[in-house]
Structure formats: structure tokens, C-alpha cells
A protein has these predicted regions:
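Active-site-adjacent pocket scaffolds in enzyme catalytic domains
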Residues: 1-43
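C-terminal domain-boundary segment and adjacent tail
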Residues: 26-126
Length: 126
């Protein structure tokens, strides 16, 4: 009792592949579009996965500039849109989960292509 499982927000990236919402897995454009889509479709929650180490490069000896930039852009976006998005952690949260996992959100393939280019550059210059 007192343990709850919160489903990850997932999306179709336009290539019929399902992805989860995470700073290392989504571009800022994808995340922003998905947040608006979730709000407009009446979703009660939007779960973003985050690990404490993901702002570092793979060798964990310096910041990952791409992921740090995504984090800053996400924080700025959420700050500018406080009237639309409520940000919170789990403490004191009363579960209000849907009976079934909602259908995946959808992101246009052009945003996926831009992310793939960004990821390729990120991997090349680790």
C-alpha cells in the first residue's frame, strides 16, 4: 500500500516507433509539441523520465551541452507557460490515473529528423 506506478508518457515519433519523454530521448521541439498536444487533448498528466546523470556526457566528466540546452529550454518553456502547465514532483500527489494507458501522442516526422541530426552531432562530439 502507498506505492503507485505512474505510466511514462510515450509518443509515436512519426516513424511508427514509440519513444518515451526524456531529455536524452526528445528534442526541445518534440517535447514542447507533445506538451501542447497533451494539454489540448485533456491529458491529466505528462510524465517526463529524468536521471540525475543525464546532464553529463557518456564518460560523465563534463556537461552534455545538447542535453543541458534541452533542459534549459524546457524550463524556460514551462516558466513562460505557467498558466497552462503545472509542474510538480510526487510528494503528496494523490494518484488520479486513467483506467487505461491513453493512446500515444504523435510527433511529426520532421521533428524526429531534426532530433536525429542533433543526436548524431551529439554522439560525434562526445
Amino acid at each position: 500500500d502507498g506505492i503507485y506506478e505512474y505510466p511514462m508518457t510515450i509518443y509515436d515519433d512519426g516513424t511508427q516507433s514509440l519513444r518515451h519523454t526524456q531529455l536524452t530521448a526528445c528534442s526541445h521541439r518534440e517535447m514542447e509539441g507533445l506538451l501542447w498536444q497533451a494539454l489540448e487533448s485533456g491529458r491529466r498528466s505528462f510524465m517526463i523520465l529524468s536521471h540525475n546523470f543525464e546532464l553529463l556526457n557518456t564518460t560523465q566528466d563534463r556537461p552534455d551541452d545538447v542535453v543541458v540546452s534541452r533542459f534549459r529550454q524546457l524550463c524556460s518553456f514551462l516558466d513562460r507557460n505557467r498558466d497552462s502547465f503545472r509542474v510538480r514532483g510526487f510528494e503528496g500527489l494523490s494518484p488520479d490515473l486513467p483506467a487505461q494507458q491513453p493512446a500515444p501522442l504523435k510527433s511529426p516526422v520532421w521533428k524526429t529528423a531534426m532530433r536525429m541530426l542533433e543526436q548524431a552531432g551529439r554522439r560525434r562530439f562526445r
